[in-house]
Structures are given as structure tokens and as C-alpha cells.
Amino acid sequence: MMTNLNVRTIKGCFPGSLPDALNDMSVINHILSLTGRFDEGQAALASTVNVVYVGTAVYDIPRYREEYTKNFIARGCGISEVCVAEARSTGATPCAAATMVTPDQLQHLAEAHIILLPEVTPFSLYDAGRKRASMRVSGQVAARGVVLVGGGCCFRAEHSDSANPKTCAQYMLSRENEVDSGRPVEMEEGGAKWEYLCVHGLSVLPGIFCPQHSSRDATGLLLNESFSKMLKRHPTERGIGVDCRAVLLLMGDGRYQVLTIANREGRTASVKDINIQIKDVVEGNVQTTTIQQQGSVEELLRKPCGPVVRDPFEAYYAMANPTALTEKLLCAPR
């Protein structure tokens, strides 16, 4: 199900590497500027900015929230959280937690100027009932000019590592306090074989999003090749591949801009590609175009040119990562 929003009016920031982007203060400043409440000359807030964190990819583990929101706090933003797994508020495990957005959480969303949604790694957001409610809410907040920050969660779908056992709830919660870094779990060599999935998102924006597009994973797989292969199974949709050091900024006035994350020690230090590419399947072949540094959103994003194909393995792997309504993933999409 796609929303009927005008993509020209949507404000958003969609990096190839969300952790690296949110550690770059220039990116934070650009995000804040989109709210209309930030004085760029003074590099300070001109009025209150509320950031709502939705921990979709990390099961509401506190250290991820702290890592992703620390620079917004440094700029004086208020932070609220909408818990997806809700394990801490209910005392239940994510497998048995409630899956309804509470009135308080809806109020946080109503007062938000920025909504931060980490990558689409697990399935906790995508239980059928919660997803439909989330789509309605996300569409409403996007329509009123709230800035969306994240990755594939906001698109129709994402090239996702959700089949990786190390992104499942039980594994991540078991190692919740093992490391100090707030970065998501990295893929490791020598584990069980798994494939990248086309995991459906909230459909605020059309297309299939691929983060870290020019990178290789820990097994040596080149993600842009994996993404092209995936698109042949979803030939009606456009792919948007964003490199690790690139950031796609939607200005809300029909324009987009490509930002560059500063080169820094860590994952992106050796990454030289700073591009965003669009990919279309034409007569069975994937055609790739590197977009300009700025341009029209209507030329960047397009609706599917035919029926949308759902990844049949999405439900299969969701059953290996159970949440309260996982079984509803087996129902036909509406």
C-alpha cells in the first residue's frame, strides 16, 4: 500500500550510513535547518525543536538511542521516544510485547518537528497491524512538514540484512550491554548463509532504498551488485542507492540536495565513493544513473510502473525473528 503524499512537499534526510551521518554536525545542522527553527549563522536553535526517536532497527536498546540523538541534544533539541518493542514499558520480551502505539506516543508524534527512524534491520515495526497504523501516522506527520530522518523505513522497501541472525531480537538483546558503541551489529564471516531481503517500509516515499550502496559487507559481497540483482525481482520499482558518505536531503519544496559526510576514522575512512544512484529495470537489464548534486525530486523519485512484487522470503525470515504479530506477515498485503 502506497501513501498518496506529494513527494515534492516531503522533508527528509536519508544517508547511506545513518550512524556516520548523525555523528557529523554539518548534517545535523542541515536537518535542523529543514525545520525552519534553526539559525544557521549562529548554529543554534531559534525556537524549540522536538525530536521523536523510533527505535525500529534496534529494539529500543537505550545505547542506540543515546548514540543517534546525542548531537541533537547538543544543539538543544528535546528528545522523546516511541517504543516499538515496548519490552521495557510492559516488562515483556519483544516476542510478547504489546504492539499498539499509545496515546502518549501519538502525542509525541503530534508535537514532533523531526522523526528519527533507524535502519529497517528487524521486523518489529512491520507486524501487519502496527505497520498499517504506523503508515497512517507517518503519512500524517510527513504531510504537515515534519522532517523524516532515516533510511529505507520511509521508502516502499529497503535492501535489508534482516535475514542475518545477528539482527534478530533475541541475539541483539542478549548482547545489549556488551559493547560501548551505539553502532548496529556488523555482519561477520563464517556464519550461517543468508540473503538480503526486500523488506517493506512505511511507503511514505516510493522506491526501494539501498544504504551503503558502494560498500562490501563482511563476507566480501558488493552491495550494489546484490541490489541490482534484487531489483530484477522487483522490476516495476526504482532503486535508490546511497553510498556510505552520501546523504540525500529532501528540501520540502520540490528540490533535493546531496550532502557529503566528512571523512573520519572508522567504517567510512576508506570509502571514496560519494554518490547516489538511481536504478531502473529496462527490458530485463538494470540501468544505473548517478544523480546530480541537486535537482528535482520528481525526477529522482517515481511511483511503480506496474504491480509491486513482495519478497516471498520476508515472511519466512520474520518467523525466525518472532514478535507479537509476526504471523500476520503471512497475510496478503493490502
UniProtKB/Swiss-Prot annotation:
Classification via Gene3D superfamilies: 3.40.50.880
One biological process term in Gene Ontology: cell division
Disulfide bonds: none
Signal sequence range: none
Keyword list, A-Z: Cell cycle, Cell division, Cyclin, Mitosis
InterPro entries, per database record: Class_I_gatase-like
Keyword hit for Hydrolase: no
Free-text function comment from the UniProt entry: Essential for the control of the cell cycle at the G2/M (mitosis) transition.
Protein family: Belongs to the cyclin family. Cyclin AB subfamily.
Protein name stated in the entry: G2/mitotic-specific cyclin-1
Native species: Trypanosoma brucei brucei
Gene symbol of the encoding locus: CYC1
